[in-house]
Amino acid sequence: MRVVILGSGVVGVASAWYLNQAGHEVTVIDREPGAALETSAANAGQISPGYAAPWAAPGVPLKAIKWMFQRHAPLAVRLDGTQFQLKWMWQMLRNCDTSHYMENKGRMVRLAEYSRDCLKALRAETNIQYEGRQGGTLQLFRTEQQYENATRDIAVLEDAGVPYQLLESSRLAEVEPALAEVAHKLTGGLQLPNDETGDCQLFTQNLARMAEQAGVKFRFNTPVDQLLCDGEQIYGVKCGDEVIKADAYVMAFGSYSTAMLKGIVDIPVYPLKGYSLTIPIAQEDGAPVSTILDETYKIAITRFDNRIRVGGMAEIVGFNTELLQPRRETLEMVVRDLYPRGGHVEQATFWTGLRPMTPDGTPVVGRTRFKNLWLNTGHGTLGWTMACGSGQLLSDLLSGRTPAIPYEDLSVARYSRGFTPSRPGHLHGAHS
């Protein structure tokens, strides 16, 4: 079957790889000159299934009000004047109760755990390189309340069979030796030994290279204008004066998927702006071993070979990609606080990207009401964590095979009432 994939981020390229391996003739289209040049370029580097959890959580609405007055707040909201933003935030608020949180976290962990298994198999099969480490993740708590709240997430981990260790502050250095210097600032941590890390952009670009060698075609520097439909079928992708045709089409444009599907399929995917710093390592014994997640500031600090990646925060501000100095200062503050000798912070590279987020935090993967239009988008802050599993799942569904995990609750059908966002005029390009 001829399949066109829209988007060359980590989710789009993973989809291309697995569809190619299933025997399909795959073409990937993107406006950028190469793979992983937008949202997949410089994310936090975590592959953390156990920490897969929606931003829509009990207590978040009240916390959001408090965060409005804090300099280093993990979440910020600025109205962009669109009805879609208001609807999306309202839907998110409706998911902030305990029942929805547990349901959403459960299916996110399910997909993320499966995805890590798929990545492990891919690594064994291809020996793909991406500065990957299998050293686990350590969530750090600064208050007793955070430490006590961890028991709620532990219940989900136990249900999913995810190994964990709840550590008092005196034991944190057993996992991350450099934290011995700052343990007095912390109340404890939750360690997930099976989690991994790696450079998402490096992985995506190497996988794209392997996919191309296997026969996948990449059409870079090719902005997409619109999908062309007739009845319940998509019959082409309009790119300037050219119409590219296939038997099936996969939407993996991240935050830009919603606008590109306007008038065809309503999906509630909204951009969640995040930031990162990439820092050269200064002192080896003062740097992280794997990944830590600061629960207070919602910031991850991840170890690559000779670099530290510091990423996090969430801004609900539309398609704004301005680099804000106060956000840089927050990232610098956290990494200096926890790893004061770890990196040359003054040499850091500052970056921002738009994560495609659904109100319930779970991606939309599967077929739409159009028989040949498929979705693989809305992974939020977990695109890297969920990419391989989502790609394999999509390939199985499109190929008519029974997937290895339950998938019905990942369909866009769970938003049956639909969203009707206005399509911004500047979004006629594609997104990776």
Curated annotation (Swiss-Prot):
InterPro entries: DadA, FAD-dep_OxRdtase, FAD/NAD-bd_sf
pH dependence text: Optimum pH is about 8.9 with D-alanine as substrate and about 9 with 3,4-dehydro-D-proline as substrate.
Reaction(s) catalysed (UniProt annotation): a D-alpha-amino acid + A + H2O = a 2-oxocarboxylate + AH2 + NH4(+)
Membrane topology: Peripheral membrane protein
Disruption phenotype: Loss of the ability to utilize both D- and L-stereoisomers of alanine as sole sources of carbon, nitrogen and energy for growth. A double dtd-dadA deletion mutant has a pronounced growth defect in the presence of D-tyrosine.
UniProt-listed GO biological process terms: D-alanine catabolic process; L-alanine oxidation to pyruvate via D-alanine
Top EC class for this record: oxidoreductase
GO molecular function annotations of the record: D-amino-acid dehydrogenase activity; protein homodimerization activity
Induction of its expression: By D-alanine. Is regulated by catabolite repression.
Membrane is among the record's keywords: yes
Keywords: Cell inner membrane, Cell membrane, FAD, Flavoprotein, Membrane, Oxidoreductase
Cofactor: FAD
Highest rank taxon of the organism: Bacteria
EC numbers, comma separated: 1.4.99.-
Positions with a binding annotation for FAD: 3-17
UniProt cross-references to SUPFAM superfamilies, sorted A to Z: FAD-linked reductases, C-terminal domain, FAD/NAD(P)-binding domain
Modulation of this protein's activity: Is activated by the HinT protein. Is inhibited by D-cycloserine.
Chief location bin: membrane
Subcellular location: Cell inner membrane
Gene Ontology cellular-component annotations: cytoplasm; plasma membrane
Functional pathway: Amino-acid degradation; D-alanine degradation; NH(3) and pyruvate from D-alanine: step 1/1
Function: Catalyzes the oxidative deamination of D-amino acids. Has broad substrate specificity; is mostly active on D-alanine, and to a lesser extent, on several other D-amino acids such as D-methionine, D-serine and D-proline, but not on L-alanine. Participates in the utilization of L-alanine and D-alanine as the sole source of carbon, nitrogen and energy for growth. Is also able to oxidize D-amino acid analogs such as 3,4-dehydro-D-proline, D-2-aminobutyrate, D-norvaline, D-norleucine, cis-4-hydroxy-D-proline, and DL-ethionine.
Annotated family: Belongs to the DadA oxidoreductase family.
HAMAP family: DadA (MF_01202)
Protein's recorded name: D-amino acid dehydrogenase
Species classification: Bacteria, Pseudomonadati, Pseudomonadota, Gammaproteobacteria, Enterobacterales
